[in-house]
Amino acid sequence: MDYGPFFDQLSKGEVIAPLPSLTLSAADNTFYRAVTGDQHLLAANSDLYRRVSGGSKELVNPGLIMQISIGQTTNATRKAIANLYYRSVEILRPVEVGETLSTSTVVLGLRDASPKADLNRGKVWLGIETRSGEEMIARYERVALLPCAGDAPGHSDEIPG
């Protein structure tokens, strides 16, 4: 099993190999609601969603869309010491049951961080896009703190936030 890269194994502009796509079901929506208690009105009431939006199916909870998208990027950060923040989060349109999501991740920047207990580490800035077919449905940025396998590589990109 691949446990993800160390900080010093990444390079700016690198595209991280994607994880498998996921087709969303009504059961996914129901399970997400049961686990989180999220009462998003239009995701909970498909009749109301269809009347309000003109959609033809059931709305997938936007929170679930983000959770799936984040989960599809964990191959870049499996070794993360910390997920520092997300920024510029956009969900661009409603997603309905039956759509298949795939997520791509690119390294936007790298910056060495201060060592802690003799462990070299660094911040990785990721650009993330989630699509249904060819259509982008979500995009955002994520910054995580990763350990180095060896010496600090000397990255000094400006990372926002």
What are these regions (language model features)?
Residues 1-86, 148-161:
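Hot-dog-fold acyl-thioester-processing enzymes
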Residues 1-14, 91, 96-99, 104-161:
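HotDog/MaoC-like acyl-thioester-processing domains
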